[in-house]
């Protein structure tokens, strides 16, 4: 009986679904054995103490979510799955240590069957449900915790106010930080308890995400505000461009400057002529931005290569660049923003990679998807100087491409400053000499005179470039007007002509259909005015023709010459 009891006890201990509820009568014995295990495994205890010591501070909400969803935590730290068994302390399987009630149960250290896992979750969370992560996110908590959480949420300045009020109020169940800040006097208690705006980047700092998720290939660019690296994401195997800010984020002012580009990217979304944004995070007090990788480099690099060989972009290519960037600017301006730093180094080139699958001829159905057939795509990048048109906070870009009215702090026509910079960018791509940063030559260009271009351009195209740098911003064409320019789209006139002809033919067809319906209506009215007797006779003759007429002729052809029975 003693051996059978020991075997039964051993099986129960080896069964990982064995919970505390099933061993209440042996609690004292298990407590003694747990002390022995702790003495035999000092490294494990030291390791847990060190983890508890260096664990970053967490809000109670996040702490409870981690206890209720340990599997999510395991996925977020892939290094735990890569540890070798040597690094783990050796413990006897016959003496599993029960969880310490003074500390959260270590879910990630021992496997559990669903039964044991659920029982441990219920014990660890107390009155909270086992699936508390979703429950806690959707259920409003105490007002103080809610305000603390809202203090760690940025407000995107480029989000339209109507959109923000419509979608961020959560049907009145949960208020945003701005709603709490704009509360009336009757809610004075809420205003007094509102925490100060905190540095979200520093509070949400992520350690070693760059090294864990990406493989750095090479450095592809260095700018005033950051360094760009070509990286491969370990999970999906795709290539991305990761931008790391040069200066660390040390306060709210630095955070706002670092977040400016992220705000603009997140609101703009995806457009074929704007460098695509994927993700951003703070790491070691530096801003990290994950963007689309453009395999053709920058337009400035291409211009430098052409200058070495004595070549320049020819007029057809210049028109293509101008048209594509105009489409990107039109998209940005329609969102109520301006770039404010258009120049060759902020325009990037993407070469279409040929597919291994058989090529299927495709026809662009509208103006929006014509770029799918283009072998080279030009995109606008580096949105660090983007500002709002309605509430401008202008930070001057490169003085070589800066419009004069911006220096005079005239912000009434901000989109036209992008047009001015784009005109000079095309002139540089055409082979113009290096632009001045100040002096007489600088003012000469601001008077509407293009720099010397070492190639002959068509009169229409040259005049278009001059219009783009007109001293009067009102006289400059808009980005939308450039996309409809006959100079950039010669086929646009033919398309409009064909469209007019098509509309004319549609009108003629509609007129004929209307006349036909009137004739049919008149004919049906005449038939309705006939007498009932005539109508009955006509109907009878019609039914006779239907039953005998046509079909009898066909049957007679088959029975011709045969005698009837």
Curated annotation (Swiss-Prot):
Residues 1-142, 169-189, 518-565 are annotated as: Disordered. ATP binds at residues 220-228, 243. Residues 521-534, 553-565 have a biased composition (Polar residues). The keyword Kinase applies. The keyword Lyase does not apply. InterPro entries: CC_SR_Kinase, Kinase-like_dom_sf, Prot_kinase_dom, Protein_kinase_ATP_BS, Ser/Thr_kinase_AS, Wee1-like_protein_kinase. The gene is WEE2. It holds the Pfam family Pkinase. Residues 214-492 form the Protein kinase domain. Oocyte-specific protein tyrosine kinase that phosphorylates and inhibits CDK1 and acts as a key regulator of meiosis during both prophase I and metaphase II. Required to maintain meiotic arrest in oocytes during the germinal vesicle (GV) stage, a long period of quiescence at dictyate prophase I, by phosphorylating CDK1 at 'Tyr-15', leading to inhibit CDK1 activity and prevent meiotic reentry. Also required for metaphase II exit during egg activation by phosphorylating CDK1 at 'Tyr-15', to ensure exit from meiosis in oocytes and promote pronuclear formation. Continuous activation of WEE2 is a cause of meiotic failure of small oocytes. In mammals, oocytes with a diameter less than 80% of that of full-grown oocytes cannot start meiotic maturation. Residues 1-12, 26-52, 178-189 have a biased composition (Basic and acidic residues). Keywords: ATP-binding, Coiled coil, Kinase, Magnesium, Meiosis, Metal-binding, Nucleotide-binding, Nucleus, Phosphoprotein, Transferase, Tyrosine-protein kinase. This is Wee1-like protein kinase 2. It comes from the Eukaryota. Residues 495-521 form a coiled coil. A motif (Nuclear export signal) lies at residues 317-331. SMART domains: S_TKc. GO terms for molecular function: ATP binding; magnesium ion binding; non-membrane spanning protein tyrosine kinase activity; protein tyrosine kinase activity. Phosphorylation leads to increase its activity. Changing residue 77 to A: Abolishes phosphorylation and ability to maintain meiotic arrest in oocytes during the germinal vesicle (GV) stage.
